[in-house]
Amino acid sequence: MRCVPVFIILLLLIASAPGVDAQPKTKYNAPLTSLHDNAKGILQEHWNKRCCPRRLACCIIGRK
């Protein structure tokens, strides 16, 4: 019977512990999603510089 309070306290501590971070991190602790967003923005910027405004049809098709 002495173990029951200890067991209940342990269950409460486990339930209140912070969860594992769902965002994968790089070795420099930066979320990979921000790196992905940055790369996507850079590619979009280069795409716009290459296409627009000389070939408007190219930009319209590329934006989907």
From Swiss-Prot:
Domain of life per record: Eukaryota
Protein name: Conotoxin Ca5.3
Family: Belongs to the conotoxin T superfamily.
Localization: Secreted
Biological source species: Conus caracteristicus (Characteristic cone)
One GO MF term: toxin activity
Domain text: The cysteine framework is V (CC-CC).
Signal sequence range: 1-22
Keywords, in A-Z order: Amidation, Cleavage on pair of basic residues, Disulfide bond, Secreted, Signal, Toxin
UniProt modification remark: Contains 2 disulfide bonds that can be either 'C1-C3, C2-C4' or 'C1-C4, C2-C3', since these disulfide connectivities have been observed for conotoxins with cysteine framework V (for examples, see AC P0DQQ7 and AC P81755).
Propiece residues: 23-48
Tissue specificity comment: Expressed by the venom duct.
Assigned GO CC terms: extracellular region
Positions carrying Isoleucine amide: I61
Chief location of this protein within or outside the cell: secreted
